[in-house]
């Protein structure tokens, strides 16, 4: 029994902000903080998020006490059913938040170690495009992780419920710009993210883009020295197989580095533009072989799909594999109430195609860094801040902001709220 009781205590010491932020940063175990005023700027619109948050802004003075949070509707499960995700209200301010409660008693030692790594980076990272943990603490034998509620959900939620054939290019540019800013910071801190995908891109009510999935981050710092490559294979990697780079999947002595995240950005770009991830529904072994043999996904539009396929009968369309040479049965969306049109009868800019091609280079050394990609011509179309433009570009989608009737003692208004929340893949947010 003492072995089980020690698990919450084992996590508790990692939750201490002083232990993680001050102690470990002083020991220089996690690389150097990127200098705020010496970093190269991109264009004016993209330079807004270079400066990190202040610690006060990140934590938002949320108290680490269970009694300060009124747990409302359960909106998800996860982490092998050991995690319950609640919509909650922070009592001192009335703000609605998301609370992850993880049963530490039932966690294996491997899971506890996994959670420790997540808490490490959540306390260490401090950037406007990385989802902040508002509070982390132990309540009884549960680990509570409090984050802001993301009213637009994840980018995957958006393409699954509203943009089934993909988003428009400008919206994707805003989203990927936020992702690359976060990755640039993460890479300078000496980490590889290893789980960049649409479900780990969260969008707040005011249109701000956040990268989550910190649980999969891997440090490239060993014994105070930054390693050229790492060899660790991601845990639970079957869920992120379509996004993983060939060099990660090879698991050979050459290893991989931060450029593996750039490949994942390219796959995510295809996911957002095509409405589904490349290699979707492929068996794992086939996906592995396709990647190792050099198969490169692409954006699906008039420049990559033969003209005869764009005009063929509505019963055929591009396959769920996300590769332009595969066909399967599908029903294209009707156009203007007339005859159905091909969903990919559109044309993305040459800059967008080139951006994706650069990200998906088979040789990782040929891929640009995150900081280089932020200066790519693809982002020249951005003229405003994401918080100003993205909500307009996501119309007719409206953020979930009406929480009336969601209190646990008042069931009259819960049904509509839960119906909306169930459309969000909260399990995949991973915060």
From Swiss-Prot:
Cellular component terms per the entry's GO annotation: cytoplasm; nucleus; serine/threonine protein kinase complex
Positions of the Protein kinase domain: 69-379
Stretches the record annotates as Disordered: 310-347
CDD domains: PK_STRAD_alpha
Modified residues (Phosphothreonine): 329, 401, 419
Positions of post-translational Phosphoserine modification: 2, 46
Bias (Polar residues): 312-339
UniProt cross-references to InterPro entries, sorted A to Z: Kinase-like_dom_sf (IPR011009), Prot_kinase_dom (IPR000719), STRAD_A/B-like (IPR047173)
Primary site of residence: nucleus
Localization, UniProt: Nucleus; Cytoplasm
Keywords assigned: Cell cycle, Cytoplasm, Nucleus, Phosphoprotein
GO-annotated biological processes: activation of protein kinase activity; protein export from nucleus
One Pfam family linked to the record: Pkinase
Keyword Nucleotide-binding listed: no
GO MF terms, alphabetically ordered: ATP binding; protein kinase activator activity; protein kinase activity; protein serine/threonine kinase activator activity
Subunit structure: Component of a trimeric complex composed of STK11/LKB1, STRAD (STRADA or STRADB) and CAB39/MO25 (CAB39/MO25alpha or CAB39L/MO25beta): the complex tethers STK11/LKB1 in the cytoplasm and stimulates its catalytic activity.
The record's note on its domains: The protein kinase domain is predicted to be catalytically inactive.
Family the UniProt entry places it in: Belongs to the protein kinase superfamily. STE Ser/Thr protein kinase family. STE20 subfamily.
Main function: Pseudokinase which, in complex with CAB39/MO25 (CAB39/MO25alpha or CAB39L/MO25beta), binds to and activates STK11/LKB1. Adopts a closed conformation typical of active protein kinases and binds STK11/LKB1 as a pseudosubstrate, promoting conformational change of STK11/LKB1 in an active conformation.
Protein's UniProt name: STE20-related kinase adapter protein alpha
Naturally occurring in which organism (per UniProt): Pongo abelii
Primary gene name: STRADA
């Amino acid at each position: 029994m003492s072995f089980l009781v020690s698990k919450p205590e084992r996590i508790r010491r990692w939750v201490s902000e002083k232990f993680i932020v001050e102690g470990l940063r002083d020991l220089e175990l996690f690389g150097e903080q990127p200098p705020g005023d010496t970093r190269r700027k991109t264009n004016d619109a993209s330079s807004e998020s270079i400066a990190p948050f202040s610690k006060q802004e990140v934590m938002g003075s949320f108290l680490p006490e269970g009694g300060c949070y009124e747990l409302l509707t359960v909106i998800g499960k996860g982490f092998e059913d050991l995690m319950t995700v609640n919509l909650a209200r922070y009592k001192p301010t009335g703000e609605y938040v998301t609370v992850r409660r993880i049963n530490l008693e039932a966690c294996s030692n491997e899971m506890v170690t996994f959670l420790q790594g997540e808490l490490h980076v959540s306390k260490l990272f401090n950037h406007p495009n990385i989802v902040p943990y508002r509070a982390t603490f132990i309540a009884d034998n549960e680990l509570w992780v409090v984050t802001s509620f993301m009213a637009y959900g994840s980018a995957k939620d958006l393409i699954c419920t509203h943009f089934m054939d993909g988003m428009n290019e400008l919206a994707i540019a805003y989203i990927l710009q936020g992702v690359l800013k976060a990755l640039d910071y993460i890479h300078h801190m000496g980490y590889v993210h290893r789980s960049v995908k649409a479900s780990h891109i969260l969008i707040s009510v005011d249109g701000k883009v956040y990268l989550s999935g910190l649980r999969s981050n891997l440090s490239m710092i060993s014994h105070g020295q930054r390693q050229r490559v790492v060899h660790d294979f991601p845990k639970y990697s079957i869920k992120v197989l379509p996004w993983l780079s060939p060099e990660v999947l090879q698991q050979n002595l050459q290893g991989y580095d931060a450029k593996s995240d750039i490949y994942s950005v390219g796959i995510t770009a295809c996911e957002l533009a095509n409405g589904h991830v490349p290699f979707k529904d492929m068996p794992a072994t086939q996906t592995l072989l396709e990647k190792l043999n050099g198969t490169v996904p692409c954006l699906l539009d008039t420049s990559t799909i033969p003209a005869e396929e764009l005009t063929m009968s509505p019963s055929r369309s591009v396959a769920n594999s996300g590769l332009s040479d595969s066909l399967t049965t599908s029903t294209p969306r009707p156009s203007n109430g007339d005859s159905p049109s091909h969903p990919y009868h559109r044309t993305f800019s040459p800059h967008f195609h080139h951006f994706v091609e650069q990200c998906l280079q088979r040789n990782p050394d040929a891929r640009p860094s995150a900081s280089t990609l932020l200066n790519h011509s693809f982002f020249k179309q951005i003229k405003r801040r994401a918080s100003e433009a993205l909500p307009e570009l996501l119309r007719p989608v409206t953020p979930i902001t009406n929480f009336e009737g969601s209190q646990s003692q008042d069931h009259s208004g819960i049904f509509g709220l839960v119906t909306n929340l169930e459309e969000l893949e909260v399990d995949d947010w991973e915060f």
